[in-house]
């Protein structure tokens, strides 16, 4: 049965479920992203290159949870009231989602390269990766992210523009993949070196601790990248195959899955990273100060100490 032009084509039960889902993700995601930004801003030892990149990704995610998701809730309410002006609201949400998604992917790419550099060349990373440089990278990231909504607004049916978008996404994932492979190879090589240093207990212990941190770095990045991929690939596929009615159920729920990624990201960091959990406790007044035994000597890895 055809859907009313004044209602999203997901049925009354679907609208109720969607309202609950979007409201929950909007509240939980906004709180999580705000907490990430605040703990990095208020904790000096988290203000590293990695920390600033994570905060930038939280800003991009906050755009989704605090703007796009409330717009979707508003749209669902208008559907119940049988008013016919939600199309404009959805299009605005779509443009903001494109902008935020591009910023997230570019930031995730920069974060993957930074972590690979920190693991494979820690001394060079410490000397070369500065906050000034990363702020320039972040500024360029937001400028580049404007390309997607601009293309959607003015060159929607342009084939070259679509190819450029596709190549951009593939290029980012290629960089992330190469960075991940190099990181894993370095961690495995470290394991072999530890096994060969059985006569030097002091070096074995220090190297083993570094190797463990590096493994956790790889795991954390793998979780974040995998979640991003699983959430966004379905809707990207639906858009690429050009389903005739882009307002159908499949498009709506796959889009919801993609947007949900912005609500989940901050809680991944709090779950896996001890430093972030402790900083959050301080922020909420549950803990007076960070314990000294959690301080990590190597600034390149300090924001990725995990469970």
Task: Tell me the role of every PLM-derived stretch.
Residues 11-23, 49-112, 118, 162-166:
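Extracellular TM2-ECL1-early TM3 structural module of rhodopsin-like
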Residues 26-29, 56-68, 133-149, 169-173, ...:
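Alpha-helical transmembrane segments of multi-pass membrane proteins
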Residues 63, 74-77, 100-113, 117-160, ...:
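Fourth transmembrane helix
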Residues 175-181, 219, 227-240, 250-299:
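Seventh transmembrane helix
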Residues 1-35, 76, 305-307:
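Extracellular N-terminal segment of 7TM GPCRs
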């Amino acid at each position: 049965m055809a859907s009313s032009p004044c209602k999203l084509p997901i049925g009354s039960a679907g609208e109720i479920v969607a309202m609950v889902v979007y409201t929950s993700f909007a509240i939980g995601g906004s709180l999580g992203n705000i907490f990430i930004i605040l703990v990095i801003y208020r904790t000096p030892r988290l203000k590293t290159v990695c920390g600033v990149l994570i905060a930038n990704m939280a800003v991009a995610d906050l755009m989704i949870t605090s703007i796009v998701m409330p717009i979707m809730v508003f749209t669902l309410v208008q559907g119940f009231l049988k008013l016919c002006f939600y199309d404009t609201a959805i299009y605005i949400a779509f443009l903001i989602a494109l902008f935020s998604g591009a910023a997230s992917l570019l930031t995730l790419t920069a974060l993957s390269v930074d972590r690979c550099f920190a693991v494979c060349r820690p001394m060079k990373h410490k000397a070369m990766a500065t906050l000034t440089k990363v702020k320039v990278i972040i500024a360029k990231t937001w400028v580049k992210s404007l390309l997607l909504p601009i293309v959607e607004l003015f060159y929607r049916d342009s084939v070259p523009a679509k190819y450029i978008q596709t190549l951009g996404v593939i290029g980012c994932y290629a960089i992330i993949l190469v960075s991940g492979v190099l990181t894993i190879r370095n961690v495995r090589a470290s394991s072999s070196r530890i096994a060969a240093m059985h006569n030097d207990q002091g070096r074995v212990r220090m190297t083993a601790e570094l190797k463990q941190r590096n493994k956790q770095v790889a795991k954390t990045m793998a979780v974040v990248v995998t979640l991003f991929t699983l959430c966004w690939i379905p809707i990207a596929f639906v858009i690429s195959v050009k389903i005739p009615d882009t307002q159908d159920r499949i498009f709506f729920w796959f889009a919801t899955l993609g947007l949900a990624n912005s609500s989940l990201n901050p809680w991944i960091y709090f779950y896996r990273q001890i430093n972030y959990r402790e900083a959050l406790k301080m922020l909420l007044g549950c803990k007076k100060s960070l314990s000294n035994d959690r301080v990590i000597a190597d600034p390149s890895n300090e924001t990725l100490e995990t469970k």
